C-alpha cells in the first residue's frame, strides 16, 4: 500500500508539472502578443501623440522640437555649434554641409505634414519578408520608410510599391532612384563622414567625382532631382546610439560602433509618426551560417563582419520597444 507521504509527493510533482505547462503556454502566447502583430482586417485606430508619449518613456528627456531634416537657415548663421562630429553631429563639416543644403531641400511634404495622425511603417530588408504577402498592407500606411538599396521592383507582393522615404548613404546608393522609388519619394542621406556630403554635392552639382574615402565605391552617376534629397538630422543617430544602444559618443577610431540604418529609421519614425509598425526586421541566430539575411540577395551574417553593427544588442533594443508598445511588428522577430 502506497504511503500517504508518497501520495503527497506525487501530488506535489503533478502540481508542479501543471504549473510549468501553464507557464510555458502563457509565456508563448505573451511572446506572440509582444513580438508579432498580425495584420488586422480593419485599420488600427491611430491615436495622436501615442508614439511621442511612448518615445518619451523610452528616451527620457525627449522633445519633438528637433527638425527631422537639416535646414539651411540653421547653418547660415550658426549660433550653437554641434558638440559632436559625424555621424552624431556636424562639428567640422559645417562649410561643406552649407553647400549641400543650398542645393537640396528640408521640407516635409504637405500631404504628410497636414495629417492629423500619421500611420507609419518601417520596412526592413530582412529575409522574413520573402513570401510574406504584406505588399498591399504596407501600401496602406501614410508613410512607408525603406532602407538603403532594398529593391521594390519584382517584390511588390511582399514589400509593397509605395515609398515615402528611403534612407541611404553613399555606399548603399546602388539602386535606380527612378525604378525603385515613386516620383515623390524623399531620398534621405544619412551622413557618417564628411566625404558623404562631398559625394552628394558632386553628384547634384555635376562636379568632379570623389573616389576615395569610402569603404565601397559609391555611384559616380546618379540621376536624381536635388529637391527630392533631404539630409537627416544627426540628432537621430545620437539618440539611437545613446538611448537605445548605450554607445559612447566619443569612441576610439578602431572601434566605431554605430546603429544600423534600420534602427535609425525606427528612431526617426517615433519622432515623425503617431503610430509605428515595423516589418522585415531581425537576423538569423549567430550559429546559423547559411541563412540569408535579406529578402533580395544571397548574403549571410558573415557579410556584416567589421560593419560596426552589434545586431544582438539592436535586437534587444527592438524587443524593448515592442514590449512597451512603442512599435508593433508585422513579421516574426
Swiss-Prot record:
Q: Name one GO cellular component term.
A: Golgi membrane
Q: In which pathway does it act?
A: Protein modification; protein glycosylation; Glycolipid biosynthesis
Instruction: Enumerate the InterPro entries for this protein.
Output: Glyco_trans_29, Glycosyltransferase_29, GT29-like_sf, Sialyl_trans
Entry keyword annotation includes Transport? no
Pfam families documented for this protein: Glyco_transf_29
| GO-annotated biological processes | cognition; glycolipid biosynthetic process; glycoprotein biosynthetic process; keratan sulfate proteoglycan biosynthetic process; lipid glycosylation; O-glycan processing; oligosaccharide biosynthetic process; positive regulation of blood coagulation
The record's PANTHER family line, in alphabetical order, gives: CMP-N-ACETYLNEURAMINATE-BETA-GALACTOSAMIDE-ALPHA-2,3-SIALYLTRANSFERASE 4, SIALYLTRANSFERASE
Which keywords, in A-to-Z order, does the entry hold?
Disulfide bond, Glycoprotein, Glycosyltransferase, Golgi apparatus, Lipid metabolism, Membrane, Secreted, Signal-anchor, Transferase, Transmembrane, Transmembrane helix
Q: Which cysteines are joined by disulfide bonds?
A: 120-273
Q: What stretches pass through the bilayer? A: 9-26
Q: What does this protein do?
A: A beta-galactoside alpha2-3 sialyltransferase involved in terminal sialylation of glycoproteins and glycolipids. Catalyzes the transfer of sialic acid (N-acetyl-neuraminic acid; Neu5Ac) from the nucleotide sugar donor CMP-Neu5Ac onto acceptor Galbeta-(1->3)-GalNAc- and Galbeta-(1->4)-GlcNAc-terminated glycoconjugates through an alpha2-3 linkage. Plays a major role in hemostasis. Responsible for sialylation of plasma VWF/von Willebrand factor, preventing its recognition by asialoglycoprotein receptors (ASGPR) and subsequent clearance. Regulates ASGPR-mediated clearance of platelets.
Q: Which residues are on the Lumenal side of the membrane?
A: 27-333
Q: Enumerate the Cytoplasmic topological stretches.
A: 1-8
Reaction(s) catalysed by this chain, per the record, are:
a beta-D-galactosyl-(1->3)-N-acetyl-beta-D-galactosaminyl derivative + CMP-N-acetyl-beta-neuraminate = an N-acetyl-alpha-neuraminyl-(2->3)-beta-D-galactosyl-(1->3)-N-acetyl-beta-D-galactosaminyl derivative + CMP + H(+); a beta-D-galactosyl-(1->3)-N-acetyl-alpha-D-galactosaminyl derivative + CMP-N-acetyl-beta-neuraminate = an N-acetyl-alpha-neuraminyl-(2->3)-beta-D-galactosyl-(1->3)-N-acetyl-alpha-D-galactosaminyl derivative + CMP + H(+); a beta-D-galactosyl-(1->4)-N-acetyl-beta-D-glucosaminyl derivative + CMP-N-acetyl-beta-neuraminate = an N-acetyl-alpha-neuraminyl-(2->3)-beta-D-galactosyl-(1->4)-N-acetyl-beta-D-glucosaminyl derivative + CMP + H(+); a ganglioside GM1 (d18:1(4E)) + CMP-N-acetyl-beta-neuraminate = a ganglioside GD1a (d18:1(4E)) + CMP + H(+)
Q: Which residues are glycosylated?
A: 61, 131, 310, 329
Which cellular compartments is it found in? Golgi apparatus, Golgi stack membrane; Secreted
Species lineage, top-down?
Eukaryota, Metazoa, Chordata, Craniata, Vertebrata
Entries under CDD domains matching the protein: GT29_ST3GAL4
Recorded GO terms, molecular function? beta-D-galactosyl-(1->3)-N-acetyl-beta-D-galactosaminide alpha-2,3- sialyltransferase; beta-galactoside (CMP) alpha-2,3-sialyltransferase activity; N-acetyllactosaminide alpha-2,3-sialyltransferase activity; sialyltransferase activity
**What is the name attached to this protein's record?**
CMP-N-acetylneuraminate-beta-galactosamide-alpha-2,3-sialyltransferase 4
User: Which modifications occur after translation, per UniProt?
Assistant: The soluble form derives from the membrane form by proteolytic processing.
| Membrane topology reported for the UniProt record | Single-pass type II membrane protein
Tissue specificity, per the record, is: Highly expressed in adult placenta, heart and kidney.
Family affiliation? Belongs to the glycosyltransferase 29 family.
Q: What is its EC number?
A: 2.4.3.2, 2.4.3.4, 2.4.3.6
